[in-house]
Design a protein with these regions (language model features):
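DUTPase catalytic domain/fold
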Residues: 1-163
Length: 163
């Protein structure tokens, strides 16, 4: 079952929201806080003993709050600090307007018990690039109820990130 955005707001699962218009019947819109350029290669293994996340360089919005991004991939950080209840998981989908401009947002599953100001991958496929404004709505986060409440919540490296 999908949980409406207004229910998440009432339950305090979204701690910081820019505007009530972010509430959707099937979730909540997440907005753009930061954009980072990847500056080197990361490393992924089986048990995370060799894991190294790519370094990044934060890109700055211009004086009018705009940022032109060329074709390529970027890391983005959201404005909203989100908490996933133990009886839910969440999935992120790009806003349709973002797709229609030739860009996409990718993320992993948001596990029960996760909380933080999450990051995602922004892929700009449009050869002409895209212009994003600070606080642009870029992703819809859809919460689904689990069949049973998780016995233990997410306890990984990214819990509490970007406070």
């Amino acid at each position: 079952m999908i949980v409406p955005g207004s229910k998440l707001w009432q339950d305090g699962q979204i701690a910081e929201t820019v505007n009530i218009s972010q509430m959707q019947p099937a979730g909540i819109d997440l907005t753009l806080k930061e954009v980072h350029e990847l500056s080197d290669a990361g490393e992924i293994d089986f048990d995370n003993s060799k894991r190294r996340i790519s370094d990044t360089k934060k890109l700055e919005f211009d004086a009018t709050g705009k940022l032109h991004l060329s074709h390529g991939c970027y890391k983005i950080v959201y404005n909203e600090y989100v908490g996933i209840p133990l009886d839910c998981a969440a999935f992120g989908y790009p806003r349709s307007s973002l797709l229609r401009c030739g860009a996409d947002v990718r993320c992993a599953v948001w596990d029960p018990g996760y909380h933080g100001r999450s990051e995602s991958l922004l892929l700009v496929h449009n050869p002409k690039g895209i212009v994003l404004h600070k606080n642009a709505k870029v992703m819809q986060l859809v919460f689904v109820r689990l069949e049973a409440k998780a016995e233990k919540g997410y306890d990984g490296k990214y819990k509490g990130e970007n406070k």
